[in-house]
Structure formats: structure tokens, C-alpha cells
Amino acid sequence: MNKGKVDVLLGLQWGDEGKGKVVDVLTPKYDVVARFQGGPNAGHTLEFEGQKYVLRSIPSGIFQGGKVNIIGNGVVLAPDLFMDEAKALEASGHDLHARLHISKKAHLIMPTHRVLDAAYEAQKGKDKVGTTGKGIGPTYTDKVSRNGLRVGDILDHFEEKYAKAKARHDAILKSLNFDYDITEVEKKWLEGVEYLRQFPIVDSEHEINNILKSGKSVLCEGAQGTMLDVDFGSYPFVTSSNTICAGACTGLGIGPNKIGEVYGIMKAYCTRVGAGPFPTELFDETGKTIRDLGHEYGAVTGRERRCGWIDLVALRYSIMVNGVTQLIMMKSDVLDGFDTIKACVAYKQNGVEIDYFPYSIEEGIEPVYEELPGWKTDMTKFTSEDQFPEAFKNYISFLEKQLETPIKIISIGPDRDQTIVRK
């Protein structure tokens, strides 16, 4: 942790790496927690005082009393879903109103954005990207084409701005011959807009830079993972924002020289939700076993996650584009019972072995594996790295050598206490 710096925490795979738990472990050390991109399509699952929460838009530092949490300009916000999420937290005793600040420049997901999402996916037929249907893509499209509604717009002449944006969407949907009725959804959405007005709506870029100037520390969290980044992920099967470290600069309004540590989170294996290429995917009983042991189902959608062995080619690429300084390995305990662990160290692309992540991994990619002995030990009760079995220590050393980055934190179970910080 660096005073006067922003430390960035992000996923290195296809999302669902376990960022929620890690943020919960790290936040006590920081003064402020900020979210820099994404929307309610991805959820962080956290356990706090025996209760499970899924946070979609609200930063995970909200459980730490007295800390300011900021929703940055790079986030897209659905007022109705935000209201549900915030009210559920308030009902469980967490006072948000003074501590949760929302950027004026964050874009609003409108009800018609969700309809557009469904209409565009229906048009694609068998080429569907597999969106969550939450309207994320169309909202970012409006942002880039300079047609978006922002949180700051709810403070002045909102009805007029909303009617204009909605009319534009209606015209597009009419041209697509897509039938819809948003009467009930819109009613709740407008309630959400009113609810949003109760929170501090701020110039977050000024706020964060002033916080840094005063010598305080900021932990910045992203949603999803590097391999879903719109520029560097497995395009077109990606999200609509920059999930990488550089997205923290554009999504919060901070300079690159303000970035301190970059924590990269990975699972001890690999998962992916929805459509898209996945070189190490397992279609056999092993894949099913990993899914069952790891409870690999989407926090928001409930969708089954596709499971496979760890992909070191993709991880090396993720570490490179993010400038990762420390690795955090999640769900090591899921592999506790395996005789043999596999790790993909290279790809064969159309028969030629390569050790880098290529332009496309959609076709002709075959994983090249190294096999390592499993540790066959229940590690969930361990409290120190000194207790790790030799085979697991060897697995860690192997990964660190392959990835050329230290693994500083290892998770051996879902609870906050089941976290080993290495010396």
C-alpha cells in the first residue's frame, strides 16, 4: 500500500476470479475504495459477518465503516438495480448515503438499453456474444457516439434529456421490428433516478486527486477480467469497457504516475462464462468436478461457468498488459484432491508451438500442458504458508517462475480468514 497512490486490483482471466473476497481482505488498509469500469453485468460475491452479499455496482469497501467509496466515471449505472442493491445493504445495517459518492460523469443504463441489448443479440443468431442482457454494450455505444445520459444529467433538465434519448432508441428498435413493453420497468427505473439524487453526486476526478494529494491511499477495483477487455481480450467475445489497469486512469481521472501496486487476481485453474474461445476448457469429468468443488456458477446470472486448467500463456499476456506487480491466487483448495495438476505452458497454433498470446484464439489452438503432482491435502484449515505441503509449494514456485511475478496472497477457502499472506 502506498500513501498518495492508487493501488489497482483486477482480474487476469475471464472474470469471476474472486475479486470481492480479496477487496474485503485488502480494504482495511486503505482510506478510499473506488470502482473504475463496468456495470451490473458482473457481481462481486462477499461474505460479511456470516451473510452473503452480491455487489454489482457498489464498491466492495462499503462494509468497512467510515470509508469513502467512489463509483467512477468509467462505470455504467442502472438506477433501478442500484436502488435494489443499496436498499438491501441499508436493510442489513450499512449506512451508505454519506459514504458512497457517485461520479457525475458515470453513464446511465436506460430501460431501452436493455431492450436494444436483446434486439442486437437476437439479430446475431448463432453468432451471439452471450451478453448478460443488462444493457451494458448499448450504454457504452451511446457513450462513445456521444449520445449518452450521464448521472450529472439527473440534476438539471432531466425529463427533456431522457425523452430525447428514449425517442432515439425507440426509432432504432422500430427499424429492427422488435416488440417490447417497458412500462413497469421504466416506472421502477424513474424511482431509481429519484433515489440516486439522495447520494453525493460529485466531480469524482477532482475528489480522487485531492484525496491523493492529501496523502491518503486509494484501492481501485475493476469488474470482470483482462481477457474480457474490449481491446486486449478475446474479441469479439468481450465486454464493452477497458478492464485492464489503464482503465483505472480513464475510469477515475488519475494519471499513470499515480498508480502504485497492481494486484492481479487469478484462480489456481481457469473459468469462463458465456460464449467465446477457451483453450484449456475441460469437457470431461475433471471439468465437472472442478465446477462442483468450486461452486462455479455466475454471481449475477447463475449461469454455469466453463472450467479448465490454468492457462499460463493467457496469464503472461495479462500480467504484461496490466503491469502486474503482485499476484493473488484464489481457490487453491478446489484442487486439493487431485492426483495430477495440469498447467498450459504454450499453445500449438495450426501445429506450430507458440508461447505468446496470438491475435485470435478462436480456431486452431491446442494447449500444451506440463503435469505436476497434486498435493492431496485439505488445506482449508491452514493458517500459515509453512503448513503448505511440498507439492503445493512446488506448484507455487513453478507458477512464479513461469509468470515471472511473485504470488503474495493465496486463498484456501471462501471465508476471509482462509487467506494466507506470504512473507
What are these regions (language model features)?
Residues 1-423:
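Non-transmembrane, aqueous-exposed alpha-helical and coiled segments at domain scale
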